[in-house]
């Protein structure tokens, strides 16, 4: 189960002499820190981490990384911060960012963030950080599924397949439907038959299709058991097709 605001990131975007840094975590503020003449990212981040740890906030864990500090807690918390004369030397966020520029260059493995993009529900997407060593440090971001969204279809309630296992022997078994891997219910919705009765199945143009009420749902092209998009950011010709008919009566 996903719980909002249990993680946070403080990203340093620049250092200079006599820059004042302010951070408030869960309503508690560190004493303002002014960077010395030898200020580097490591110096600033180490001092900020020490001061945050000194607040002794229950359940709070901090991790210093290349250009950021990651905070996690076993309960929701608030996070804010400022740095620089024009507040341009620190980015602070929790579960989401507006642009990719706000993300740290490195973070912990499996750190998931929502990119709001233009602000519209259908333009948002989720990224997960994959650390090369499986822990933290150098790595890359890849598109992923919202942590509050189900992975997809329930094979026990979906159509099954009859498999010829040997001469005159058949096995009725569940189909290994491809899990939903990216997006959420707004950007990569369930096919329309979910929650309804499937009345007919068919193949068309290298797709598996299902009829349900006044809708028709077809799989990825050439991938019969995949009813979801592979990206919430782009649309391709091979993506699933889901249509609603204007009437269920023959014309």
Segment roles from a protein language model:
Residues 1, 55-58, 62, 108-113, ...:
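Short alpha-helical segments and helix-capping/turn motifs at coil-helix boundaries
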Residues 1, 5-7:
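Extended, well-folded catalytic/binding cores that form a central cleft or groove in large enzyme
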Residues 8-13, 45-49, 53, 97, ...:
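Short, well-ordered alpha-helical packing segments
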Residues 9-81, 108-131, 158-160:
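Extended, beta-strand-rich, solvent-exposed assembly scaffolds of outer structural proteins
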Residues 44, 48-52, 80-184:
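N-terminal accessory interaction module
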Residues 67-70, 170, 208, 216:
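Hydrophobic residues embedded in beta-strands of well-ordered beta-sheets
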Residues 175-207, 211-251:
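Beta-propeller and closely related beta-pinwheel folds
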């Amino acid at each position: 189960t996903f719980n909002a605001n249990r993680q946070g990131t403080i990203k340093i975007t620049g250092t200079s002499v006599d820059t004042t840094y302010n951070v408030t975590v869960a309503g508690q503020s560190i004493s303002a820190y002014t960077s010395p003449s030898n200020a580097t990212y490591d110096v600033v981040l180490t001092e900020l981490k020490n001061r945050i740890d000194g607040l002794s906030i229950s359940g709070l864990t901090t991790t210093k990384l290349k250009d950021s500090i990651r905070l996690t807690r076993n309960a929701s918390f608030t996070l804010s911060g400022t740095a620089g004369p024009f507040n341009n030397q620190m980015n602070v966020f929790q579960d989401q960012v507006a642009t990719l520029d706000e993300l740290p260059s490195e973070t912990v493995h499996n750190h998931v963030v929502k990119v709001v993009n233009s602000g519209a529900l259908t333009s948002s997407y989720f990224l997960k950080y994959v650390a090369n060593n499986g822990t933290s440090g150098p790595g890359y971001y890849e598109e992923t599924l919202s942590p509050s969204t189900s992975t997809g279809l329930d094979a026990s309630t979906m159509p099954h397949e009859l498999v010829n296992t040997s001469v005159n022997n058949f096995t009725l078994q569940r189909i290994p439907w491809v899990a939903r891997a990216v997006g959420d219910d707004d950007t990569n919705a369930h096919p329309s038959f979910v929650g309804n009765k499937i009345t007919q199945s068919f193949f068309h143009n290298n797709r598996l299709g299902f009829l349900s009420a006044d809708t028709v749902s077809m799989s990825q092209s050439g991938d019969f058991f995949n009813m979801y998009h592979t990206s919430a950011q782009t649309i391709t010709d091979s993506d699933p097709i889901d249509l609603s008919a204007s009437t269920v009566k023959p014309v």
